[in-house]
Every structure is written in C-alpha cells, then in structure tokens.
C-alpha cells in the first residue's frame, strides 16, 4: 500500500497502467466530477 498515489491525478496515471491497487479508486474517480 505504501508508495501508491492517493490523489486523483496520481490515481489516473496508475489507472492508465491498470494498477490493481488503484483500479478501484479510478472507478470511483470516474463516477465523480473530473477536474
């Protein structure tokens, strides 16, 4: 869990690489307003 970005931008970047840890967060971010 350490070393993984928890903010939206960082999560988007890891999501592009299909990061398994950030995948769930990316789904939540996609349902929220993207800024």
From Swiss-Prot:
Q: Does the keyword Nucleotidyltransferase apply?
A: no
Residues forming the LCN-type CS-alpha/beta domain are 1-35
Give its localization.
Secreted
What InterPro entries does the annotation carry? LCN-type_CS_alpha_beta_dom (IPR044062), Scorpion_toxin-like_sf (IPR036574), Scorpion_toxinL/defensin (IPR002061)
Query: SUPFAM superfamilies annotated for this entry?
Result: Scorpion toxin-like
Stated family: Belongs to the long (4 C-C) scorpion toxin superfamily. Sodium channel inhibitor family.
* Protein name as it appears in the record: Putative neurotoxin
Q: Which organism is it from?
A: Rhopalurus junceus
């Amino acid at each position: 869990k350490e070393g993984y970005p928890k903010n939206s931008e960082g999560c988007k970047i890891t999501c592009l690489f299909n990061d398994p840890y950030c995948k769930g967060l990316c789904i939540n971010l996609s349902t929220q307003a993207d800024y």
